[in-house]
From Swiss-Prot:
Compositional bias of kind Polar residues: 50-70
Listed SUPFAM superfamilies: P-loop containing nucleoside triphosphate hydrolases, RING/U-box
UniProt main location, coarse: plastid
Biased composition (Basic and acidic residues): 558-570, 927-946
Record key words, sorted: ATP-binding, Chloroplast, Coiled coil, Metal-binding, Microtubule, Motor protein, Nucleotide-binding, Plastid, Transit peptide, Zinc, Zinc-finger
All copies of domain Kinesin motor, residue ranges: 104-421
Species this protein is from: Arabidopsis thaliana
Residues the entry annotates as binding ATP: G184, V185, T186, S187, S188, G189, K190, T191
Name of the protein in its database record: Kinesin-like protein KIN-7M, chloroplastic
Coiled coil: 422-509, 621-658, 704-826, 873-904, 935-999
Record-linked Pfam families: Kinesin, zf-C3HC4_3
Length: 1058
C-alpha cells in the first residue's frame, strides 16, 4: 500500500480491528464560518434554523460501537480500541430533528518525502508509518500513535481525498455541514495537499469536481451553489474575492456567527469555481523563510454553500449545507530565523494555532469548563465545527526528518487530542420561504405567467380607462399601434432573458433530459454574481479582470477543454440525427440558444485573454506568439461551433413550422432572427477586435525590429569609437603602459605585503596566545610566591617566638646555676662549720646536694632539646628562603619574557603601520593623489601609537598590581590582613571577569530572552515543574504545555510581577 513504510516493520498491534466505513470517525463541519449564514443578510429571519444551538432539522442515523480508553501514545497513557461503523443513511422529516449517536473527528496523517536539503544535511528518518493506521518512532518503538489512516511519502493526493475528504463532500451534498482542514508546521505540505497544482490537483479542486459530478448524477433535485473565500492575516479577516473587503468583522445572530460584508458568488461549473480561487490566491499573503520560498502567511477558508430542493411539484423544503475547505498557515519555530514583518506574522500564526490547541485540549477534557473560542478569529469561526455540529476531517502533514523530530511529535500530539473530540452531525433543512433558490423559482414562475398573458394579449394591471385609451390610439393610426407592438415585443424579450438568466443559476442534472448533449454538468464557464442582471459578456470580462496573468493560462485551458466538449457534443452529425428523429421542443430550442450564448461568452473570454497576451508580448514576443496563435485558433473554432448551432436552430425552426401556429411561429422566427442578428453583430465586433489586436501585434513587432536595428547601430558606433581611441598618440599609449606596469608592480607588492600582513597577524595571534600562557604561568608563580611568603612569615614568627623562649630559658638556666652555686657554697660552708662544731648529719646534706645536681642535668637536657629544635627551624627557614628565591627568579624571568613579548608586539604594530603606509603609498600612485594617503598614514601611525600606549599602560598596570601584591606579601606580619584583602580582591576581579564573559556569551543570542511563542515580549515566567524560562506572561497564561519540553504546566512563577 502506498501509505505503508518502505522498510520491513513488525505488524501493527491494531491489525485485528475491523475496517471502518467511509464515515468512520467522520468529521464535523463548521456551520458557523462565513457560514452559519444560510442566506444573504437581507433574506435571513429570526425563524431560520440555528445550527450552533443544535436545533436543526433532519439528521442521519448511525449506530456506533467504540471503545477508546485514551488517544495518547501506545505504550503510554492509553491505546485505541476497536471501532465499528455500519452503513448510515439520511433520515428525517420537515420540522423534526433526529440526531445520530456520538462520533469522533476523522484524523489522517500524511508524510511528505524528505527534501534534497534534508539529505544534504544528513538527516535521518525518525518517524515512519507502520502499516496503514500507525505512526511509530524509529528510536523508541514504544512511542506510537494510531489514527484513522496514515499515508506514506509515496501516496498521492487523490488517495488522501478518497479517504479524508470524499465522505465529507458526499454528506455535504446530502445536507450535513462539513469541514476539511490541513494542519502542520511550515514546509510540511499543507498547501500542496489542499490546493496542489495543474499536474497534481489538491483536495479543493477534487472536492469541487466531485460536487458537480454529484449534481449531474442526482436527478429530480435542483441545486444552487455559492462560494466565498477569505483569509485571516495577523488576526484580520480579508475578503479574497473583493480586494476592498478588508478588516471584516465577525457578527452573531440567531443562526450563529458570520462574517459581515463577505462577498458570495454563484458558480455554475468547476472551472467557474476554480477561477474564483485563482483570483483569490492573487490577493493572499505569502512570503519566504528558511524552509520555503512561498510560505503561506495567513489562514484561508474556502466555503461552498449548497442549496437544494425537489424539482417540480414534489417540493418539500430546501436543504442547506456548507462545505468549508481550510488551509492553515504553518506554525513556526526559532529555526526559521525570521525578522521584522515575517516575525510578526509568525507570532500571530503561532498565537492562533496555540489557541486552537488550547481549545481542542479543553474540548477533550470532557469537563464543563470555559472553552476560549473568542481568543482567536480562527477558533471563533471554527466554533461550530469543533463543537460537533457536522463532519470534520483533519489532515495532519508531517515530515520524517530528524531535524524536525519535535515539530512532528507535537503535530502528532495535536492530532491525537483532536481524535478524542466527539461530534453529533445532523442534516439541515429550511422549511421557510427565505432560501435563495426558492426565491428564484418563484420569480421564474411569476415571469412565465406574465409572459403567457402578454402572448394572449392580456396585460396584467391594465384598467378599463387604459383600454379605452388604447382603442382610441388604435383608431388614431397604424403607426402608434406598431410602436405599441414593438414595446410589447421588447417586454417579452426582457422577460425571456430574465427567465433564462434565473434558470441558468439553478443547476439541474441533465442525465435523463437530452441524451448525447451534456456529459457531466452544464458547461457554464462563466462568472455570474447572484442578483445581478448585467449582460453575460460584461460579466465574463469582469471575472477575467479578477484573474492574474498567471491564472489566465489555466482558465484559458479550461475554456479550451469546454470548447472541446462542445465540439464533440455538438457535431453536425449529431444535430442532423436529432433533427431526423423529431421536431425540437421549445425547451430544447432555448437550450440551444443558451449554448450559443455560452459560446459567445467563451469567445469574449478568449478575446480578453488575447488582449492580455498581446500586452505581455512586448517583453517576449517570440514565446507569446505561439500562445496568441493558439487562442486565435480557439476563437475561430468557437465561431465555427456557434455557426453550426445557429444553423441547427434555423433547421429546427424550419422543421417546427409545420406543427406550430402562425403567431407562435412568427414570434419564434422574430426572436431567432433577433438573436442571430445580435450574434452576427457580436461576431463582427470580435473579428474587428481580432484584426485590431493583430495590427497592434504587428506594430509591436515592427517597433521591436526597429529597436534591434538601433541597438545594432549603437554597437557599430561603439566599435568605431573604440577604433578611434586606439589610434591616439603613441606617447600617451607608452605612458599608459608604463602606468599599467607600475600599477601591476604595485599590485604585486600589495599582494606580497598582504601576505606578509597575514603572516604577521598569524604570528601576532600566536604571540598573544604565548603571552597569555606566560601570563597565566606568571600569575600562578606569583600565587605560589605569595603563599610561600605567607608560610615563611608564619615560620619566622614561630622562630622568633622560639628564640625568645630560648633566651628566656637561658636566663632562667643561668639564674638557676648561680643560685645552685651560691646554695652549694653556703651548704659547704655550713657543713664545714657544723662538722667543725659538732659533726651533725652529713647524709642529709648529701641528699640536698644530690637533688640540686639532678635538677641541673634536667635543665641541661631541656636546653639541648630546645637548641636542636631551633636548629631544625632555622634549616626549614633556610629552605623556605631558598624556595622563595627560586620563585622570585621565575617571576623575574616571566617579567623579562613578558617585556620581550611586549617589545615584539610593539615591533609588529610598527611593521603593520609600515605595511599600511606602503599600501597607502601604492594607492596614492594609482590615484595620483598624495595628500590623502599621507593623512591616512598619520592617522594609522597615531592609531598604532595609541594602541601601543594603551597596551603598555595595561601591561604597566598589571605589573604594578603584581609588584604591589609581591611587596605586600614580603612585608612584616603586621600587614598580613592587608595581604589577605588584596588576595580576596584579586579573586573578586577574576570572578567578575568570568561573569562578564558569561553574560556576553549569553547576550550573543538575541532570542535567548525572547518569548518562544510570540517572539516579541521578553520572557517573564518560570514554568513548573520543568522550570523553563521561555514565555512571557500572556503566552504563559494561554499555554497549557511547555513549548520546549512539552510537559504539562502545573503552575507559573512570574519573575517580574506588576
Amino acid at each position: 500500500m502506498a501509505s505503508s513504510s518502505s522498510r520491513t516493520r513488525s505488524r501493527s498491534p491494531f491489525s485485528h480491528r475491523r475496517p471502518p466505513s467511509p464515515y468512520s470517525s467522520a468529521s464535523s463541519t463548521s456551520s458557523s464560518l462565513i457560514n452559519n449564514r444560510l442566506l444573504p443578510r437581507s433574506s435571513s429571519t429570526p425563524t431560520s434554523t440555528v445550527y450552533n444551538s443544535g436545533g436543526v432539522t433532519g439528521s442521519r442515523s448511525m449506530s456506533i460501537t467504540r471503545t477508546i480508553s485514551d488517544s495518547g501514545p501506545i505504550g503510554g497513557s492509553g491505546t485505541y480500541g476497536a471501532q465499528s461503523y455500519p452503513s448510515e443513511g439520511l433520515i428525517g422529516e420537515s420540522g423534526q430533528t433526529i440526531t445520530s449517536e456520538r462520533d469522533s473527528i476523522s484524523v489522517t496523517v500524511r508524510f511528505r518525502p524528505m527534501s534534497e536539503r534534508e539529505y544534504q544535511r544528513g538527516d535521518e528518518i525518525v518517524w515512519y508509518p507502520d502499516a496503514d493506521k500507525m505512526v511509530r518512532n524509529e528510536y523508541n518503538p514504544l512511542t506510537a500513535y494510531a489514527f484513522d489512516k496514515v499515508f506514506g511519502p509515496q501516496s498521492t493526493t487523490p488517495e488522501v481525498y478518497d479517504v479524508a475528504a470524499k465522505p465529507v463532500v458526499k454528506a455535504a451534498m446530502e445536507g450535513v455541514n462539513g469541514t476539511v482542514f490541513a494542519y502542520g508546521v511550515t514546509s510540511s505540505g499543507k498547501t500542496h495537499t489542499m490546493h496542489g497544482d495543474q499536474d497534481f490537483p489538491g483536495i479543493i479542486p477534487l472536492a469541487i469536481k466531485d460536487v458537480f459530478s454529484i449534481i449531474q448524477e442526482t436527478t429530480g433535485r435542483e441545486f444552487l451553489l455559492r462560494v466565498s473565500y477569505l483569509e485571516i492575516y495577523n488576526e484580520v479577516i480579508n475578503d479574497l474575492l473583493d480586494p476592498t473587503g478588508q478588516n471584516l468583522r465577525i457578527r452573531e445572530d440567531s443562526q450563529g456567527t458570520y462574517v459581515e460584508g463577505i462577498k458570495e458568488e454563484v458558480v455554475l461549473s468547476p472551472g467557474h469555481a476554480l477561477s474564483f480561487i485563482a483570483a483569490g490566491e492573487e490577493h493572499r499573503h505569502v512570503g519566504s523563510n528558511n524552509f520555503n520560498l512561498m510560505s503561506s502567511r495567513s489562514h484561508t477558508i474556502f466555503t461552498l454553500m449548497i442549496e437544494s430542493s425537489a424539482h417540480g411539484d414534489q417540493y418539500d423544503g430546501v436543504i442547506f449545507s456548507q462545505l468549508n475547505l481550510i488551509d492553515l498557515a504553518g506554525s513556526e519555530s526559532s529555526k526559521t530565523e525570521t525578522t521584522g514583518l515575517r516575525r510578526k506574522e509568525g507570532a500571530y500564526i503561532n498565537k492562533s494555532l496555540l489557541t486552537l490547541g488550547t481549545v481542542i485540549g479543553k474540548l477533550t477534557e470532557g469537563k464543563t469548563t470555559h472553552v476560549p473560542f473568542r481568543d482567536s478569529k480562527l477558533t471563533r469561526l471554527l466554533q461550530s465545527s469543533l463543537s460537533g455540529h457536522g463532519h470534520v476531517s483533519l489532515i495532519c502533514t508531517v515530515t520524517p526528518a530528524s531535524s524536525s523530530t519535535e515539530e512532528t511529535h507535537n503535530t502528532l500530539k495535536f492530532a491525537s487530542r483532536a481524535k478524542r473530540i466527539e461530534i453529533n452531525a445532523s442534516r439541515n433543512k429550511i422549511i421557510d420561504e427565505k432560501s435563495l433558490i426558492k426565491k428564484y423559482q418563484k420569480e421564474i414562475s411569476t415571469l412565465k405567467v406574465e409572459l403567457d398573458q402578454l402572448r394572449r394579449g392580456v396585460l396584467v394591471g391594465v384598467s378599463h380607462e387604459e383600454l379605452l385609451s388604447l382603442k382610441q390610439q388604435l383608431q388614431e393610426g397604424q403607426v402608434k399601434m406598431q410602436s405599441r407592438l414593438e414595446e410589447e415585443e421588447e417586454a417579452k424579450a426582457a422577460l425571456m432573458s430574465r427567465i433564462q438568466k434565473l434558470t441558468k443559476l439553478i443547476l439541474v442534472s441533465t442525465k435523463n433530459s437530452i441524451p448525447g448533449y451534456l456529459g457531466d454538468t452544464p458547461a457554464h464557464s462563466r462568472s455570474i454574481s447572484a442578483g445581478k442582471d448585467d449582460k453575460l459578456d460584461s460579466l465574463l470580462l469582469d471575472s477575467d479582470n479578477l484573474a492574474s496573468p498567471s491564472s489566465t493560462l489555466s482558465l484559458a485551458s479550461d475554456a479550451r477543454r469546454s470548447s472541446s466538449k462542445f465540439k464533440d457534443e455538438n457535431s453536425p452529425v449529431g444535430s442532423r440525427a436529432e433533427l431526423t428523429q423529431g421536431v425540437m421542443t421549445p425547451d430544447e430550442m432555448d437550450l440551444l440558444v443558451e449554448q450559443v450564448k455560452m459560446l459567445a461568452g467563451e469567445i469574449a473570454f478568449g478575446t480578453s485573454t488575447l488582449k492580455r497576451l498581446v500586452d505581455q508580448s512586448m517583453n517576449d514576443p517570440e514565446n507569446s506568439k505561439t500562445q496568441i496563435q493558439n487562442l486565435e485558433n480557439d476563437i475561430q473554432e468557437k465561431q465555427r461551433q456557434m455557426k453550426s448551432l445557429e444553423q441547427r436552430i434555423t433547421e429546427s425552426g424550419e422543421a417546427s413550422i409545420a406543427n406550430a401556429s402562425s403567431i407562435e411561429m412568427q414570434e419564434k422566427v422574430m426572436r431567432l432572427m433577433t438573436q442571430c442578428n445580435e450574434k452576427s453583430f457580436e461576431l463582427e465586433i470580435i473579428s474587428a477586435d481580432n484584426r485590431i489586436l493583430q495590427e497592434q501585434l504587428q506594430t509591436k513587432c515592427t517597433e521591436n525590429n526597429e529597436l534591434h536595428e538601433k541597438v545594432h547601430l549603437l554597437e557599430q558606433r561603439l566599435s568605431s569609437q573604440k577604433a578611434t581611441l586606439s589610434c591616439c598618440d603613441v606617447v600617451t599609449e607608452e605612458y599608459v603602459d608604463e602606468l599599467k606596469k607600475k600599477v601591476q608592480s604595485q599590485e604585486i607588492e600589495n599582494e606580497k605585503l598582504k601576505l606578509e600582513h597575514v603572516q604577521s597577524v598569524e604570528e601576532k595571534s600566536g604571540l598573544r596566545v604565548q603571552n597569555q600562557k606566560l601570563a597565566e604561568e606568571a600569575s600562578y608563580a606569583k600565587e605560589l610566591a605569595s603563599a610561600a611568603a605567607i608560610e615563611l612569615k608564619n615560620l619566622a614568627d614561630e622562630v622568633t617566638k622560639l628564640s625568645l623562649q630560648n633566651a628566656k630559658l637561658e636566663k632562667e638556666l643561668v639564674a638557676a646555676r648561680d643560685l645552685a652555686a651560691a646554695a652549694q657554697k653556703r651548704n659547704n660552708n655550713s657543713m664545714n662549720s657544723a662538722a667543725n662544731r659538732n659533726g651533725t648529719r652529713p647524709g642529709r646534706k648529701a641528699r640536698i646536694s644530690d637533688s640540686w645536681n639532678l635538677n641541673q642535668e634536667n635543665l641541661t637536657m631541656e636546653l639541648q632539646a630546645r637548641k636542636q629544635r631551633e636548629a631544625v627551624l632555622e634549616a626549614a627557614l633556610a629552605e623556605k628562603e631558598y624556595i622563595e628565591e627560586e620563585f622570585r627568579k621565575k617571576a623575574e624571568e616571566a617579567k623579562r619574557r613578558e617585556e620581550a613579548l611586549e617589545n615584539d608586539l610593539a615591533n609588529m604594530w610598527v611593521l603593520v603601520a609600515k605595511l599600511k603606509k606602503a599600501n597607502s603609498g601604492a594607492l596614492s600612485i594609482q590615484k595620483s593623489d598624495e595628500a590623502e594617503p599621507a593623512k591616512e598614514d598619520e592617522v594609522t601611525e597615531l592609531d598604532n601609537k595609541n594602541e601601543q600606549n594603551a597596551i603598555l599602560k595595561e601591561r604597566q598596570l598589571v605589573n604594578g598590581h603584581e609588584e604591589v601584591i609581591v611587596a605586600k606579601a614580603e612585608e612584616t606580619p603586621k600587614e598580613e590582613p592587608l595581604v589577605a584583602r588584596l588576595k580576596a580582591r584579586m579573586q573578586e576581579m577574576k570572578e567578575k571577569e568570568m561573569k562578564s564573559q558569561a553574560a556576553a556569551a549569553a547576550n550573543a543570542d538575541a532570542n535567548s530572552h525572547i518569548c518562544k511563542v510570540c517572539f516579541e515580549s521578553p520572557t517573564a515566567t518560570i514554568l513548573l515543574p520543568c522550570r523553563h524560562f521561555c514565555l512571557c506572561k500572556s503566552c504563559s497564561l494561554a499555554c497549557s504545555e511547555c513549548p520546549i519540553c512539552r510537559t504539562k504546566i502545573s503552575d507559573r512563577l512570574f519573575a517580574f510581577p506588576s
